[in-house]
Amino acid sequence: QLRRGGRSVDLDWLLDLGGGVSWSDLQRLLIDSQGRIAIDQSLEELEKLWLLHLEQSMPLQHLVGVCPWRDLLLEVSSAALIPRQETELLVDLALAFAGGRPPRSWADLGTGCGAIAVSLCRAWPEAEGHAVDLSADALALAKKNLKALAPQQSCRLHHGSWWLPLQAFWGQLEIVVSNPPYIPSPLLGELDPVVREHEPHVALVGGEDGLEAIRSLLIDAPHALAPGGVLFLEHHHDQSESVQDLMRAAGLVNVSAANDLEGIARFAQGQRALSSVL
């Protein structure tokens, strides 16, 4: 099939998630080409999925309906962004900040498929969680993932923009995490077709400079966070200084950056002052 195009790592991924063929199964076939392995779908069906990926730039995750992320296998669709590996670090940052003392209340703003919310629910089963999204379809997807992967944990779903649906909880949110849209609109055309043509632009594009959503989100952050509460944001690879400046201008303190897996500053955090008067 690789003669038709595509990357071997993507074909291996499809065989694994779509066909139930593990990496070790593939290695055994390389050693013994006459060997047999069981597959969950017919080769014809897998070939159809591969051609859709090659010819229509369909994301493999959409074709099989799932995406592995951290220790989870999440249901995904075109209703929300496919969770990226680097976003796993947002969860790591939140967990490290909490240490051995889970927050009483946390929130995931722009939850999408619910990847972050599910992870935080599983890490902090006794905490009160909130997941917010502007898209009703994304919230429906998040609800499915929360029900399947964190059925015993408490997480309320809220439909609306950023902090607004959480006004009843302002001043109580101790840890808040968000992966907002941050791609500058002039760069949209440069994105890979698999992203540009099949993932929701409302969750990708952050205006002309990519900071529109982040500015909006920061307006109410000092009011909505609990005293000493922290906000973690993911941003574009070249926005670190700008996002930190915006956090300070909004009144947050202890502002700092954190790097992604490649050593690039892709995350920012800031706190509401313990004794802030707003």
Name each model-derived stretch.
Residues 89-190:
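Conserved SAM/SAH cofactor-binding pocket of Class I
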Residues 14, 57, 87, 116, ...:
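Residue-level signal for inorganic ion chemistry
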Residues 274-278:
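Flexible, glycine-/basic-rich loop-and-beta segments that form/coincide
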Residues 208-272:
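Conserved Class I SAM-dependent methyltransferase catalytic core
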Residues 182-213:
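Mobile active-site "lid"/loop adjacent to the S-adenosyl-L-methionine
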Residues 1-10:
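Non-catalytic nucleic-acid substrate-recognition regions in nucleic-acid-modifying enzymes
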Residues 94, 120, 195, 217-221:
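Class I S-adenosylmethionine-dependent transferase superfamily signal
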Residues 15-96:
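Conserved AdoMet
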